[in-house]
From Swiss-Prot:
The gene is trmB. GO terms for molecular function: tRNA (guanine(46)-N7)-methyltransferase activity. Transmembrane segments: none annotated. Substrate binds at residues 135, 167, 204-207. This is tRNA (guanine-N(7)-)-methyltransferase. It holds the Pfam family Methyltransf_4. Catalyzes the formation of N(7)-methylguanine at position 46 (m7G46) in tRNA. Keywords: Methyltransferase, S-adenosyl-L-methionine, Transferase, tRNA processing. Belongs to the class I-like SAM-binding methyltransferase superfamily. TrmB family.
């Protein structure tokens, strides 16, 4: 898969003292280096065998990833994020609460999936609130495209899941079409369409505010055959 168009733009944003502390002091405890020579062995990287590994692509400030890791200590979580403020925030939280079942990689998700994730190694992939690139001329920048999903399917084991969530209805329709068109997947909703928010996905403060204002959120959960 050759994807030259990035689904994100790196902007120079403010980093708080706590976030910088996370990057400077504790990132090395959690980071998987992209420049290692071979695909990762998750049993080695997490220090345990037989644990399911779930990847979150674009974890933002890490709120959902942190909560899910804390609630599911039996699972491994690998977070992929390019924005340093979010990485620092998550790492600081992980250190403060001594969470040990999370690793992070600070790199482009497409590159990571192509070269570092073994095939059939993941229990699931979650992509929560990816950039909708709502202007039509920018739709080509959207992360979730057919080629990208085809690559994800190879990395997920049979019965593994892809869970997407978005608060942009047009993007939800696009994601539904892309996932429904992939023959290796089936919709967890037997009647098709969108899923209720699974209890496993934490409700963010942003989402709670949106609900009060009447804004919609669409969850999509597809399973690999």
């Amino acid at each position: 898969m050759q994807r030259k168009i990035k689904s994100y733009v790196l902007r120079a944003g403010r980093i708080s003292n706590r976030q910088q502390q996370g990057l400077d002091l504790w990132l090395e405890d959690y980071e998987l280096k992209f420049d290692s020579p071979s695909p990762w062995n998750f049993a080695k990287e997490f220090g345990r065998h037989d644990a399911d590994t779930i990847v979150e692509i674009g974890f933002g400030m890490g709120t959902s990833l942190f909560t899910m890791a804390m609630n599911n200590p039996q699972c491994n979580y690998l977070g992929i994020e390019v924005h340093k403020a979010g990485v620092g925030s998550l790492v600081a939280d992980l250190h403060e609460h001594q969470i040990t079942n999370v690793r992070v990689v600070v790199h482009d998700a497409v590159d990571v999936l192509q070269t570092k994730i073994p095939e059939n190694s993941l229990a699931g992939v979650q992509i929560f609130f990816p950039d909708p690139w709502h202007k039509k001329r920018h739709h080509k920048r959207r992360l979730i495209q057919s080629e990208f999903i085809q690559m994800l399917v190879k990395k997920i084991r049979p019965s593994g899941f892809i869970h997407c969530a978005t608060d942009w209805e047009d993007y939800a329709e696009h994601i539904l079409n892309v996932l429904s068109s992939e023959s290796a997947l089936f919709n967890q909703q037997k009647e098709g369409g969108y899923s209720p928010r699974p209890d496993s996905r934490p409700l963010t403060k942003f989402e709670q505010r949106g609900e009060r204002l009447g804004h919609g959120v669409w969850d999509l959960v597809f399973i690999k055959k």
